[in-house]
Amino acid sequence: MSFLSDLCERASKLDARVAFGESGDPRVLDAAIRLEREGVAHPILVIDPADGAGTAAARKSGLECIDPSNDPRCEALAAALLASRAKHGMTADEAAKLSHDPLAFATWLVKTGDADASVGGAVRTTRELMHFALWLIGPANGVKTVSSAFYMVVPPFRAALAANSSQLSSDSPQADSVPEVLTFTDCSVVPNPTAPQLADIAIAAAAARKKIVGDEPRVALLSYSSKGSGGTSPSIALVQSALQLIRTRAPNLIADGDLQADAALIPDISTRKSPGSPVAGRANILVFPNLDAGNIAYKLTERLAHAKAIGPILQGLAMPVSDLSRGADADAIFHVAAITALQSARFYPSGDQPL
């Protein structure tokens, strides 16, 4: 069974409630209708009365719709916003106005338990979505860095590696170790991570992948250098410092760096560039040194390699909220919702949360 099929099958067993704060967008509405039709999740459409056409389409869909402009829960939402942001200058009037914002209200539904997850960002910016997520939900206990990951589904990856490796053919036992899906992190939240933040990102991505994909995480901290081959630049030192922090904080996590991308993914090259590495040639989580690299890499992989980019999935929040690329199609939104549903702590025993 493919990753996407398995993902939807597991999500369908949860009957998760997923709130959408941009239901007026046709892509979002199409994804929500599909979620309901295929039984993957129960969508909740938070409508915007100012968007007449979008609201009409949402109501016509027959899905559950909530109008925050006349919902009594807005009073509690306004109070929560004011409590969170008054010290930063937010007034009571501003909080009251924001309480009617569909994106804020969708996040509030998760906070209050009226939804298990929320998904936004098809229209609004990551910055807007992150504001509401951090103001209303905040980081999980012990988490200092909230970050994001894309799950890059690359079915042709096995064939590509076989074509580029004398040691790996499509029917080789080693081919089983080549992932169908790669985790790219961070691609949308932390612009220039410090070494502790890189370690946070790697550890959060590994924990999320274990729940979402189900395989053994293998983390490659990427660089233009492999095992110091690029000299002693600050960027290499940063990655190497992050690796030491990972080994201290998560000693059982398979991780290595600094690694060039080809050394992380292609077994033949790894034997020359990083012999003896526990990861090289078998990485399934690629940790980029900064947001420029991560964002560029996922978009190039999506557009040139025809990979399916699912995300950005936020990591490190106390409750599941996911962002979207504004370039996402309905299929990507559908699968982001399925992944986000799987992250809800309601579906895991205490102490076994996905993040």
Segments and roles (model prediction):
Residues M1-A280, I285-L355:
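Anion-binding alpha/beta catalytic cores of soluble intermediary-metabolism enzymes, centered on
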